[in-house]
Amino acid sequence: MVGKAEDLDLCFGKMMVFGGDGVGGGMMRGVGVITEWKDIPMELLLRIVSLVDDRTAIVASGVCSGWRDAICLGLTHLSLSWSKNNMNNLVLSLAPKFTKLQVLILRQDKQQLEDSAVETIAKCCHDLQDLDLSKSFKLSDRSLYALARGCPNLIKLNISGCSAFSDAALGYLSGFCRKLKILNLCGCVKAASDRALKAIGYNCGQLQSLNLGWCENVGDVGVMSLAYGCPDLRALDLCGCVLITDESVIALANNCLHLRSLGLYYCQNITDRAIYSLAHRRLNNKNMWKSVKNRHEEEGLINLNISQCTALTPPAVQALCDSFPALHTCPGRHSLIISGCLNLTSVHCACAFQAHRTASAFPHPAH
C-alpha cells in the first residue's frame, strides 16, 4: 500500500511540474494548474476511476467532497460481488450517493442482501437498466414491488435462484418494467408460473432472452403466451420444464421467427412433431430470412439442447440439422446437444457430410 501511495505522489508531482513553467513554478503562477488532488478535472478523474476496480472507486469517492460529487454523478457501472459479508450495508450506504447507476451487479455466494437494500436502490437509482440479484435467497416480494415502482427502465434483470418470489409479484413487475429484454428466472420455481408468463407475454413485447431453467411449474399455456406476446424472442431456456409438450415448441416455431437458442433438456414430452415444426419453419420463412441476409446477425437456430428427450428419432433430428447448418454435432463445435439420447448417435451436422465429400474427392493411393 505504501508503494502505491508513493507512486501516486510521484505522478502528482509530475502533473504539477508540467502544468507550470517546467521547473515547478506552476504551483504558484499557472492559472488552473493542478496543485492538489482535488483540483483534478472531473473528466480526468472519471477516466482514472474507469481504470480501477469498483472497490477502489468507492474508496476514491471518500477522498474529498469534490471527488465524491464527481464520482457519484459520473459512475454508471458498479459491482459489489466482491463483498463477502457486508453487501447489504454497502448498498444502503452507496445507493443514495450513486444515483446515476445504470448497471448494478449484486451477485452473491452466500445470503447477504435484504429487501431494505433493494428498496433503497429502487428509491434512489431510477436510471437503472441492468440489475443482477442472483442467489438473493433472503429477498421477498417486497423487492419486486419496489423495483416495479422505482426502476421502470430496467432492460436486463437477473433474479435466478431467488426462490421466495411469487408469481403475483413477478406479474406486477412486468406491468411496470415493460422495456425488459433479458430476464433470468432460472430456479424461480414459485415465481415462474403460467400466470406470470401470461403477464410477461402481455406486457414485455420487447423480450429477447428468457431463462426458465428448472421452473417445473411452467406449462404450455405459459410458453404459448410468451410465443404470441414476445415475437422477438431470441433465446429461451426451458431445461427441466417437464410439463411442456409439442404445443409449446410449435407455438415458438410459428411465432418467434428470430429464435436462435432453445433449451429443452429433460423435456421428455417433446416428440418428433415439435422437431419437424422447427425444421419446417426454415422453409416457411425462407423469404423473410432472405430479406435480412445482409445483417451481421445470423438468423435461424444456432443452439439447441435436446438432451434426455428420449422420444425423438434420428430422421426428425437429422431434418432439423439439414435445415439449420449452424447446428453442429462435430467435436469442438457442439451446438446441438443430444446427451442421453443413444438412438440419435447417427445424426450428423453438415460438417460431417462435407468432410465425407472432401475425402471422397481424393483417390486412395495404390497399395
Where are these regions (language model features)?
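Short helix-loop-helix/strand-helix junction enriched in hydrophobic and basic residues
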Residues: 57-73
